[in-house]
Amino acid sequence: MEFLPLFHNLRGSRVLVVGGGEIALRKSRLIADAGAVLRVVAPEIEAQLSELVVQSGGEMILRGYSECDLDGCVLIIAATDDEPLNAQVSRDARLRCVPVNVVDAPALCTVIFPAIVDRSPLVIAVSSGGDAPVLARLIRAKLETWIPSSYGQLAGLAARFRNQVKGLFPNVQQRRAFWEEVFQGAIADRQLAGQGAEAERMLIAKIAGEPPPETGEVYLVGAGPGDPDLLTFRALRLMQQADVVLYDRLVAPTILDLCRRDAERVYVGKRRAEHAVPQEQINQQLVALAKQGKRVVRLKGGDPFIFGRGGEEIEELAAHGIPFQVVPGITAASGCAAYAGIPLTHRDHAQSVRFITGHLKNGTTDLPWSDLVAPAQTLVFYMGLIGLPVICEQLIRHGRSADTPAALVEQGTTVNQRVFTGTLANLPQLVAEHDVHAPTLVIIGEVVKLREKLAWFEGAQATL
């Protein structure tokens, strides 16, 4: 290990920055964020850096560098494009045994700046020892996506009770076990879900020795339209800590594979006129599993609150006092339209968009057809494949032109995506000609014409 990772408390200490340009500004921002007082030395200092110095309560010295500028400073930064000057600053600092960093010159440094993930008070530093800074930044970028910002709040919660826990458990092993339970259990879940007050209440109860609640928690997670890359970070995190996953037919296998490997998987999918598991039974199953103390992911295609019956499920959970979280997903209308190259709204073609269920009941649909034929709007029908002849017929009968552009998006956002475009008049015919199957989204409106020049994703299938 060439460099020993340390965290330096600079609050209120003076730091010398030699240089007044963009490089010096970048370093000075980090230093100022740590609460240091800046001393910047350069013949010219750019405006943003000047403001930063003033905000830190520091000083600007408008001249060339002098060895006496190091007086009273605990850290030295050489941030100029003058290599001999940078080398001189490094030598002077070393002679005084003051830590020095020379930008982009590891050989002249006694300290280097890592790539930083800031979730204060939790801070993560990644360094390549100056050998591959781009690689360190790429690793930092991955960590930024893996570690929610709420981890900082979780660390802050622990900090507020640290001394109290230390007094309760004088043995370090006991304290470690206590905090591991906190960070891996329901208290952390509440804090990460944005329920800080409840997390604090539970931590106080745990410190007081009260038995923890036996109830688990349910995560209602939107799996999006099919492409795993469209999952949210929170969805992925909760999927990977679930004990049980209840999933429906619209959840792609590639998404299901991202769940925790040893989680129990329960299929509760539904097909038209064939409910594998009645909705009421799904609701009861969620309650029963949570009462067993399990973390349950209810994984639903698209967004759980858009034609997903998510509202019914959490009503049941709320009635039984079961804690739950709702993680939105990209709904099929947004995802499939984007991957098909069809903007749902457009200044020249559509000023509004409607999401509509096309599900037939007793062979018909009970929809406000007169409203649906208004101009300058896009219609998106979910579950509309079986009822498509009725939908097209009713729209034309109520005044929508038979030549209105329309599209079918089958298995949108996946490698098996197929898109077929036509008009209201021939859309049902396209279904038969190309053997189109669910899940298929129906998009109706002038915006469909834009696909000819905006299509960008074709998947593995030909489109028409």
Curated annotation (Swiss-Prot):
<keyword id="KW-0597">Phosphoprotein</keyword>
<dbReference type="InterPro" id="IPR019478">
    <property type="entry name" value="Sirohaem_synthase_dimer_dom"/>
</dbReference>
<keyword id="KW-0511">Multifunctional enzyme</keyword>
<keyword id="KW-0456">Lyase</keyword>
<feature type="binding site">
    <location>
        <position position="383"/>
    </location>
    <ligand>
        <name>S-adenosyl-L-methionine</name>
    </ligand>
</feature>
<dbReference type="InterPro" id="IPR003043">
    <property type="entry name" value="Uropor_MeTrfase_CS"/>
</dbReference>
<feature type="binding site">
    <location>
        <begin position="43"/>
        <end position="44"/>
    </location>
    <ligand>
        <name>NAD(+)</name>
    </ligand>
</feature>
<comment type="pathway">
    <text>Cofactor biosynthesis; adenosylcobalamin biosynthesis; precorrin-2 from uroporphyrinogen III: step 1/1.</text>
</comment>
<comment type="pathway">
    <text>Cofactor biosynthesis; adenosylcobalamin biosynthesis; sirohydrochlorin from precorrin-2: step 1/1.</text>
</comment>
<dbReference type="GO" id="GO:0009236">
    <property type="term" value="P:cobalamin biosynthetic process"/>
</dbReference>
<keyword id="KW-0489">Methyltransferase</keyword>
<dbReference type="InterPro" id="IPR000878">
    <property type="entry name" value="4pyrrol_Mease"/>
</dbReference>
<keyword id="KW-0808">Transferase</keyword>
<dbReference type="InterPro" id="IPR036291">
    <property type="entry name" value="NAD(P)-bd_dom_sf"/>
</dbReference>
<dbReference type="Pfam" id="PF00590">
    <property type="entry name" value="TP_methylase"/>
</dbReference>
<feature type="binding site">
    <location>
        <position position="412"/>
    </location>
    <ligand>
        <name>S-adenosyl-L-methionine</name>
    </ligand>
</feature>
<feature type="active site" description="Proton acceptor">
    <location>
        <position position="248"/>
    </location>
</feature>
<keyword id="KW-0627">Porphyrin biosynthesis</keyword>
<feature type="region of interest" description="Uroporphyrinogen-III C-methyltransferase">
    <location>
        <begin position="216"/>
        <end position="464"/>
    </location>
</feature>
<dbReference type="GO" id="GO:0004851">
    <property type="term" value="F:uroporphyrin-III C-methyltransferase activity"/>
</dbReference>
<dbReference type="Pfam" id="PF13241">
    <property type="entry name" value="NAD_binding_7"/>
</dbReference>
<feature type="binding site">
    <location>
        <position position="306"/>
    </location>
    <ligand>
        <name>S-adenosyl-L-methionine</name>
    </ligand>
</feature>
<keyword id="KW-0949">S-adenosyl-L-methionine</keyword>
<dbReference type="GO" id="GO:0032259">
    <property type="term" value="P:methylation"/>
</dbReference>
<dbReference type="GO" id="GO:0043115">
    <property type="term" value="F:precorrin-2 dehydrogenase activity"/>
</dbReference>
<dbReference type="InterPro" id="IPR014777">
    <property type="entry name" value="4pyrrole_Mease_sub1"/>
</dbReference>
<comment type="similarity">
    <text>In the C-terminal section; belongs to the precorrin methyltransferase family.</text>
</comment>
<comment type="function">
    <text>Then it catalyzes the NAD-dependent ring dehydrogenation of precorrin-2 to yield sirohydrochlorin. Finally, it catalyzes the ferrochelation of sirohydrochlorin to yield siroheme.</text>
</comment>
<dbReference type="InterPro" id="IPR050161">
    <property type="entry name" value="Siro_Cobalamin_biosynth"/>
</dbReference>
<feature type="binding site">
    <location>
        <begin position="301"/>
        <end position="303"/>
    </location>
    <ligand>
        <name>S-adenosyl-L-methionine</name>
    </ligand>
</feature>
<feature type="binding site">
    <location>
        <begin position="331"/>
        <end position="332"/>
    </location>
    <ligand>
        <name>S-adenosyl-L-methionine</name>
    </ligand>
</feature>
<dbReference type="GO" id="GO:0051287">
    <property type="term" value="F:NAD binding"/>
</dbReference>
<dbReference type="InterPro" id="IPR006366">
    <property type="entry name" value="CobA/CysG_C"/>
</dbReference>
<dbReference type="InterPro" id="IPR014776">
    <property type="entry name" value="4pyrrole_Mease_sub2"/>
</dbReference>
<dbReference type="GO" id="GO:0019354">
    <property type="term" value="P:siroheme biosynthetic process"/>
</dbReference>
<dbReference type="Pfam" id="PF10414">
    <property type="entry name" value="CysG_dimeriser"/>
</dbReference>
<protein>
    <recommendedName>
        <fullName>Siroheme synthase</fullName>
        <ecNumber>2.1.1.107</ecNumber>
        <ecNumber>1.3.1.76</ecNumber>
        <ecNumber>4.99.1.4</ecNumber>
    </recommendedName>
</protein>
<feature type="binding site">
    <location>
        <position position="225"/>
    </location>
    <ligand>
        <name>S-adenosyl-L-methionine</name>
    </ligand>
</feature>
<feature type="modified residue" description="Phosphoserine">
    <location>
        <position position="128"/>
    </location>
</feature>
<keyword id="KW-0169">Cobalamin biosynthesis</keyword>
<feature type="region of interest" description="Precorrin-2 dehydrogenase /sirohydrochlorin ferrochelatase">
    <location>
        <begin position="1"/>
        <end position="203"/>
    </location>
</feature>
<feature type="active site" description="Proton donor">
    <location>
        <position position="270"/>
    </location>
</feature>
